[in-house]
UniProtKB/Swiss-Prot annotation:
Disulphide connectivity of cysteines: none
Residues forming coiled coils: none
Catalytic activity: L-histidyl-[protein] + S-adenosyl-L-methionine = N(pros)-methyl-L-histidyl-[protein] + S-adenosyl-L-homocysteine + H(+)
Organism, as annotated: Bos taurus
An example Gene Ontology CC term for this record: endoplasmic reticulum
Glycoprotein keyword on record: yes
Protein name from the UniProt record: Protein-L-histidine N-pros-methyltransferase
Length: 318
């Protein structure tokens, strides 16, 4: 009887998903049609032209306060970024894999977060900076090496991999169990979210990349980072999507407001950057350098890739 009931439930779910995926008004159906009918010069190939991509790095320095003008580092579309874009565009054209990912995402979104689904499927990798951009921002050479890195909210570890050649020991934290699995496959030492503050040692570099707007207590997080950072040569590399829209992701894709609010003001990228020195000062940091970079994510059937505007800072303790 239980087997029959389970079979009926599965059948009903399959019918519902099929109707959802293949209705003539469905974005999935339209995307499939575009993939089948467009050639190499069609909409998918045309997405994200070179001229548009260069706009990702533009900063109006005249709108920055004087102290920030002095530490701004101009970045550019480089080879490492272009390789990520090319790979993402290629993957988005793998039609049957994208169909499979879409089906699995539809089913698993009922009881898993989008982050965990991506970790399970091994898709949706993020890109914050290339090796060259990382080195220019920290003012280090390719051979520079130090002892200990902590990457908070490391996701699948692809960004960690870019930083890892410069460190002898690499630690990471992550909430998603499937992302932890991805990190462990890369041989990184995964610490619990309440463990990294209590290891008894300090970190030479702590990365906090696009995490402050997705955690419940961003102010507490900044202060915890300060408490375990090596006090003289230690640095924090912190990325933040601007304009700032904080929320906390829960199972089923539900969004909640964080319990702590960062006082970030302004309507555009430059105005919001101007309010951040005071936010960092309250946590015990000053800005040593910063840049504007695209926060990229691998695409799917609908887009070759996704992009948001990042401000990436190097912070030093005071």
């Amino acid at each position: 009887m239980r087997l029959l009931a389970g079979w009926l439930c599965l059948s009903l779910a399959s019918v519902w998903l099929a109707r959802r995926m293949w209705t003539l008004r469905s974005p999935l159906t339209r995307s499939l049609y575009v993939n089948m009918t467009s050639g190499p010069g069609g909409p998918a190939a045309a997405a994200g032209g070179r001229k548009e991509n260069h706009q990702w790095y533009v900063c109006n320095r005249e709108k920055l306060c004087e102290s920030l003008q002095a530490v701004f580092v101009q970045s550019y579309l480089d080879q490492g970024t272009q390789i990520f874009l090319n790979n993402s565009i290629e993957k988005s054209g793998w039609l049957f894999i994208q169909l499979y990912h879409s089906f699995v995402s539809s089913v698993f979104s009922l009881f898993m977060s989008r982050t965990s689904i991506n970790g399970l499927l091994g898709r949706g990798s993020m890109f914050v900076f290339s090796p060259d951009q990382f080195q220019r921002l920290l003012k280090i050479n390719p051979d520079w090496k130090t002892h200990r890195l902590l990457d908070l909210g490391a996701g699948d570890g692809e960004v960690t991999k870019i930083m890892s050649p410069h460190f002898e020991e690499i630690y990471a934290t992550e909430l998603s169990e499937t992302m932890i699995w991805q990190l462990q496959k890369k041989k990184y030492r995964v610490l619990g979210i309440n463990e990294w503050q209590k290891t008894g040692f300090q970190y030479d570099v702590i990365s906090c990349l696009n995490l402050l707007d997705r955690c419940d207590q961003p102010l507490t997080l900044l202060k915890d980072i300060r408490s375990v950072l090596e006090p003289t040569r230690g640095r924090v590399i912190l990325a933040l999507v601007l304009p700032f829209h904080p929320y906390v992701e829960n199972v089923g894709g539900k969004w909640d407001k964080p319990s702590e609010i960062l006082e970030i003001k302004g309507q555009n990228w430059e105005e919001q950057v101007n309010s951040l020195p005071e936010v960092f000062r309250k946590a015990g940091f000053v800005i040593e350098a910063f840049t504007r970079l695209p926060y990229l994510c691998e695409g799917d059937m609908y887009n070759d890739y996704y992009v948001l505007d990042d401000a990436v800072f190097v912070l030093k303790p005071v």
